Amino acid sequence: MEKLNLVSLPHFVSVENLSAEEVEALINRAEYFKNGGATPRLTQPVYISNMFFEDSSRTHTSFEMAERKLGLTVIPFDPAHSSVNKGETLYDTSLIMDAVGVNIEVIRHSQNEYYQDLIHPKKHQHLNIGVINAGDGSGQHPSQCLLDMMTIHEHFGHFKGLKVAIVGDITNSRVAKSNMELLTRLGAEVYFSGPEYWYSSEYDKYGKYEKLDKLIPEMDVMMLLRVQHERHSDDPNEKNFDAQAYHEEYGINHKRYQELKPDTIIMHPGPINHDVELSGDLVESDKCMFTRQMQNGVFMRMAMIEAVLRGRKLGGLN
């Protein structure tokens, strides 16, 4: 019997340190779960808490579904009614969660790399809790990145040579940053489009910026990004933002949809701004993978959580 190649990690905070083999193993494991494969048998209870300090519906719900499918005990956490509002630090909150017996915390936070203090405790600090990053500011979004890779792999069967366009509010998108790096490593050709004031030359090492209409007929994957108005408080372009004008220049409308190759897929991390990034009546079109991404997210998050269970030898796994 062939031995399963299973990933084992003490924390899951970024995709940058994952090898191509580990990414492949996570995709295979997620597809196994999706196809009805048995979940690992836990011989000891495992307690997990979802600590979302930024609004979320898809990611939060998806993680909780994944946790329950794996048989974990979910400990509720509501930041609006926590001692964070009294000035408690994230480290101290995590210390308390560790002390009461929580084994893993899934965290979304507005601060980039908030997890550094949690996974690298300073001298005389004894925090010992697994951390899964559900999104840090405009930094990384590993679970979204990996569910996107799963969705692409499910459709095409490979990454090598695929042409992928990342379109929209790139500077403020943690999804874009995770995906551009990993797609490049997996052999895809990455292109960028969208407002140039939301693009930085630091992304040139991953791909090439082009006007959208030049990319439309050539791409295999159109990865659309939400315009993140909540991160534009200091952006002078925000006050001049016009949704209709954005859609006309950077959105996928019916004309552009018809110009896509027959096998091209459209992806979006959600929530979709209808008639901004994508025409509203195309959200459930054949090429749009939005709901497929959400479905795959549950199974990929199961694979990610299992990797941390194994990495920390929780539930009797190793």
Swiss-Prot record:
Coiled coil: none
UniProt superkingdom: Bacteria
InterPro entries in the cross-refs: Asp/Orn_carbamoyltranf_P-bd, Asp/Orn_carbamoylTrfase, Asp/Orn_carbamoylTrfase_sf, Asp_carbamoyltransf, Asp_carbamoyltransf_Asp/Orn-bd
EC number: 2.1.3.2
Keyword Membrane assigned: no
Pfam families hit by this protein: OTCace, OTCace_N
Cross-referenced SUPFAM superfamilies: Aspartate/ornithine carbamoyltransferase
Gene Ontology CC terms: cytosol
Keyword Transferase on entry: yes
A single MF term (Gene Ontology): amino acid binding
UniProt binding sites for L-aspartate: 86, 174, 226
Gene3D superfamilies: Aspartate/ornithine carbamoyltransferase (3.40.50.1370)
GO terms, biological process: 'de novo' pyrimidine nucleobase biosynthetic process; 'de novo' UMP biosynthetic process; amino acid metabolic process
Catalytic activity reported: carbamoyl phosphate + L-aspartate = N-carbamoyl-L-aspartate + phosphate + H(+)
Disulfide pairings: none
Annotated residues for binding of carbamoyl phosphate: 58-59, 108, 141, 144, 270-271
Family membership: Belongs to the aspartate/ornithine carbamoyltransferase superfamily. ATCase family.
Subunit organization: Heterododecamer (2C3:3R2) of six catalytic PyrB chains organized as two trimers (C3), and six regulatory PyrI chains organized as three dimers (R2).
Protein role: Catalyzes the condensation of carbamoyl phosphate and aspartate to form carbamoyl aspartate and inorganic phosphate, the committed step in the de novo pyrimidine nucleotide biosynthesis pathway.
Name this protein carries in UniProt: Aspartate carbamoyltransferase catalytic subunit
Species, as recorded: Lactobacillus gasseri (strain ATCC 33323 / DSM 20243 / BCRC 14619 / CIP 102991 / JCM 1131 / KCTC 3163 / NCIMB 11718 / NCTC 13722 / AM63)
